[in-house]
Design a protein with these regions (language model features):
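Sec-dependent bacterial lipoprotein signal peptides
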Residues: 1-18
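Short loop/turn and low-complexity linker motifs enriched in small/turn-promoting residues
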Residues: 16-145
Length: 145
């Protein structure tokens, strides 16, 4: 029994980290929460972002920015794509500035520089971890429908 009680906190903490949903459980971000970068870009590329599932921040949207401009508000197990000009883009993750509940009062600011080549598609995913909080990372194995 003592061994069980010593392991229980570790199991509970591990349950808070996010996990990748199966492809059939991922849905597109609804159009009313996709705010920018939907027009085709001549000689541009595409950035595709999906968000993992998990308890931490699970009831909140987070904001995705492209070149520090609000581009979408994404929930758990959702995916969104952006058509962006070629060149170096700044892909960011912040609190949702349109949310006036407790979800919008935290602190979150993660950015990654992305070199976009004409015609390219790059994949990223949003994770939430016990120690590091939210992060946006390149995704070399995106879920395939």
């Amino acid at each position: 029994m003592r061994h069980f009680l010593s392991v229980l906190p570790l199991v509970l903490l591990a349950g808070c980290s996010s996990f990748r949903p199966d492809a059939e459980h991922i849905t597109p971000v609804p159009g009313d929460r996709v705010l920018a970068y939907q027009e085709d870009q001549q000689n541009g590329g595409r950035l595709v972002v999906n968000r993992d599932m998990g308890l931490m921040g699970g009831g909140c949207y987070v904001a995705i920015e492209v070149d520090r401009k609000l581009a979408a508000r994404i929930g758990m197990a959702e995916v969104v794509s952006f058509n962006v000009p070629a060149g170096t883009r700044v892909l960011g993750l912040t609190i949702d500035p349109l949310d006036d509940t407790l979800c919008g009062m935290g602190r979150l600011h993660k950015e990654v520089a992305v070199k976009v080549a004409p015609g390219s598609t790059q994949y990223f995913h949003i994770v939430s971890e016990n120690r590091g909080g939210f992060d946006i990372r390149p995704d070399d194995k995106p879920p395939q429908p």
